[in-house]
Structure formats: C-alpha cells, structure tokens
Amino acid sequence: MDGDLAIGKMASSTSPMGPIDSLELLDLLFDRQDGVLRHVELGEDWGHGEDQVLPGADSDDFLNSILGSGDSDSPTWSPAASDSGISEDLPSDTQDTPPHGGVPATPAGCHSVESGKGPCPSYHPGPTCPARHLGPVAPRLETSVAIDLEMWSPGVYAEEQTDLADSPSRYNLTVKDLLLSSSSGDLQQHHLAAPHLLRPGTGHCQELVLTEDEKKLLAKEGITLPTQLPLTKYEERMLKKIRRKIRNKQSAQESRKKKKEYIDGLETRMSACTAQNQELQRKVLHLEKQNLSLLEQLKKLQAIVVQSTSKSAQTGTCIAVLLFSFALIVLPSISPFASNRAESPGDFAPVRVFSRTLHNDAASRVAPDTAPGSEAPGPGPNTGALQERSPGSPPGEWESQDTRALDNSTEDLDNSTLVQGNSVKELDQATLLDCAPPEPAVSPGHVGLEAAGGEL
C-alpha cells in the first residue's frame, strides 16, 4: 500500500515538472522527513561496517543491471519489458554522427584498463588526462529518471538501500557520473577487442599508436585523430577505413609481386624455349640441305646406272649378232655330215677322160654303172647335184657346190616334200642314163684315141 502511494506521489511530482536532477530524485526518495520511502523499514542501521555491505563485484553487477549498457551503440538504454527506465532525449547517437562543434562531455577521469578485470575497477577520481580535441559533439541533455519500485523485493531493496547509502559517502559520485562512467566503460571494453591499438601513456590514460602508413593516409584524407582514447564512432570508422585501405594495398602489393615473379618465370621459360626453337630450326635447315644434296647424288647415280645398262645391252646385242653370224658361216663347213657324204662309195663314179680337148664334150660324161636295185633306200639330198658335176670342174667349184648342197640339205630337212621331189628327179635322170642307147663299136679312130690316152 505504501509502495502504491509512493509511486502515485512520484508520478504526480515528476509528470508536471519534466526532467529533474538525479540528486533531487534521491532526495525525493530517501529524505527522512519528506521522502517517499521514509516509512519503509531498511532492516538494519546505516552505520554498519564494510563487512555487512555487499561486495564490490556484486554492487557493480547490480548497478550495471540497472545502469549498464545493454546496447553498445548508446550510453543509456531502457529495459524492453518495463514502462519505466532510464531514457535520454537525444536526437541520435552522438558517436554515430561526425563531430560538428563543441566540446564533448567526458568523465571526471579516464582510467587505465587491464585485461581480465572490469571496465572500471575503482570509482576514485584520478588525474585527468591532458586536454584534447575530440571534435564537435552535440551537447548532452539532462536525463529524467523514473524508478519502478515493484521490481524490487523488500530484502533486495534493503541491501540496495544500504549500498546506495554507503556509496555516496565512499565514492562521492552522482547518478550522472555513474551513467557517464558506464558509457565510458563500454567504450573501453570495445577497445579491448583491439589491444594493438592501445599503448599505456602517462598517468592512467591510453594512447593511440598509429603506423607511418596510417599517418600518411590520414594526412592525405585530411583527418586528424586524437592520440588518446576513447575514440568516437566516426573516428573509429575512419581509422578502420584507413586500415582497410592499408590491408588492401598490402594485398595488392603481394599479388603484384607474385604476378611479377610468375611473369618473370614465364619469360625465362619462353626465352629458353625460343633459343631451343632457333637451334632446332638451324638443325632442320642443315638437314634439308643434306637431303637435297643426297637427292642430287641419287639422281646422278640413277642416270649413270641407266647409261651403263643401255650400253651393256647394246654390247650384248652386238656380241650375240656376231656369234650368230659366225655360227651361220662356220658351222656348215665343219658339219659332221659333210665328210660322211663325201666318203660314201656311191657318191662318185670313176670317169675315163680321153683328152683335155674333149673335156667339155657331152660324150665324155659316162654314167656310173649301177644296178636298178643297188641304190640306197633313201635318196640323198645331194645325189643329183653330185652327179651333175663335171669331171673336169675345179675343186673350188666343188666346195661351193658342197656349201650349196649343205644349204639345200638344211632346207630339205625343213621341207621333206621338196627333198622327195628332188630324189624323184634324180631317179628320173638315172633312168634316162640307163636307157641311153649302147655305143657303137669302137672305130679305129677311137682306138687310136684310146691309145693316145693311154700313153698320156
């Protein structure tokens, strides 16, 4: 019941007057005479020692649960499930917009941050950092605070009441200072993600360390960053942009270096392949010349072989013709059949020559005495020719007649009909000789001739 009355009174007191100071709010709540919570039992006296107060870590957690930053982008936030909370009437986040002018509100002192500890290990005011220009920031408006008492149980409220009662005497800070210190602690926690950006400076401040490339790019962009932390969102964005450019530049340099090495390797290989190709081309030209010379030599050899073949053929032909002619001339004279014919007893008959003056007389020719059946079974081819020879013909004429007889014999062997005809003619001539009339009785003149012949 008292809680409802207190809430109604607080709402009626805060609604018409707008934003009030945090000290006035605390006086309104905890004043012993006119405070809203003056009738609420606090459990024990405020004068207990430090051993009965909540530990520092628990009190910090409790304060962070009330005043902590659920949203890292803004220093203050309001719980989503409650109608009341801490709100700040700002047009937009001051760290999201670039600075325009003025001096930003900073905490009483910035403290060094150690890894593994909370963002604000102590609330004692330390030596302030050197004054620096953080850029123009919109002025911070006064905050109006509304507290919902239904969220607190009596026991928790008693402990919190003890902690809050002891905190002003120990730390001498206001709610506004706690809010600002909480927001600065969030920024410091955000900067802990990049420890290489920080360097311990003089006192309790952190110093921003920039490389030469970053300084050059910042100077080129016309941006001036402070040497002390924390940085605003705009400054952080610009620093990230500069570092991204540096990384891109380094990666581009590495890629260009690799590309250059690759191209150099390709050029080296190409030069080696070109030299090898030229050497092979020279070898090919040399081989082509050798091939042409060998072809010319082959043609010459072929021409020589053709000429020698034709000459040998002509020589052989001439030799063959000469041998054939010699055979035709010599073979008839050395024929084995000619001697046999000459030595046969029936070829010649003895003829009585009475006188040289009667050599050409037909009466001196006397046919051989042959019986009708004494002739050889087969008529010889030269019988008629031998009988027609005159006894007084010279031997040269006989040889020529023999040669002709041999020729005729060769022809007779080829043509048997002609031979038979000649034999018939010879037989007819022999018959005629046999049928000749007998000679008359020897006259005295004839006897005288015979005697003269005998004397010769």
Curated annotation (Swiss-Prot):
Region span, Basic motif: 240-269
Pfam families registered for this protein in UniProt: bZIP_1 (PF00170)
Glycan attachment sites: N408, N415
Spans annotated as Disordered: 1-20, 47-120, 365-423, 435-456
Cytoplasmic topological domain residue ranges: 1-317
Keywords: Activator, DNA-binding, Endoplasmic reticulum, Glycoprotein, Isopeptide bond, Membrane, Nucleus, Signal-anchor, Transcription, Transcription regulation, Transmembrane, Transmembrane helix, Ubl conjugation, Unfolded protein response
Domain named bZIP: residues: 238-301
SUPFAM superfamilies reported in the protein's UniProt record: Leucine zipper domain
GO BP annotation list: regulation of transcription by RNA polymerase II; response to unfolded protein
Numbered residues of crosslink Glycyl lysine isopeptide (Lys-Gly) (interchain with G-Cter in ubiquitin): K289
Gene Ontology MF terms in the entry: DNA-binding transcription factor activity, RNA polymerase II-specific; RNA polymerase II cis-regulatory region sequence-specific DNA binding
Site (Cleavage): L358, H359
Entry GO CC: endoplasmic reticulum membrane; nucleus
Polar residues bias locations: 71-85
Annotated segments matching region Leucine-zipper: 280-301
Spans traversing the lipid bilayer: 318-338
Quaternary structure, from the entry: Binds DNA as a dimer. May form homodimers. Interacts with ATF6. Interacts with SYNV1/HRD1; this interaction leads to CREB3L3 ubiquitination and proteasomal degradation.
Family membership: Belongs to the bZIP family. ATF subfamily.
Role description: Transcription factor that may act during endoplasmic reticulum stress by activating unfolded protein response target genes. Activated in response to cAMP stimulation. In vitro, binds the cAMP response element (CRE). Activates transcription through box-B element and CRE. Seems to function synergistically with ATF6. In acute inflammatory response, may activate expression of acute phase response (APR) genes. May be involved in growth suppression. Regulates FGF21 transcription.
Name used for this protein in its record: Cyclic AMP-responsive element-binding protein 3-like protein 3
Gene behind this protein: CREB3L3
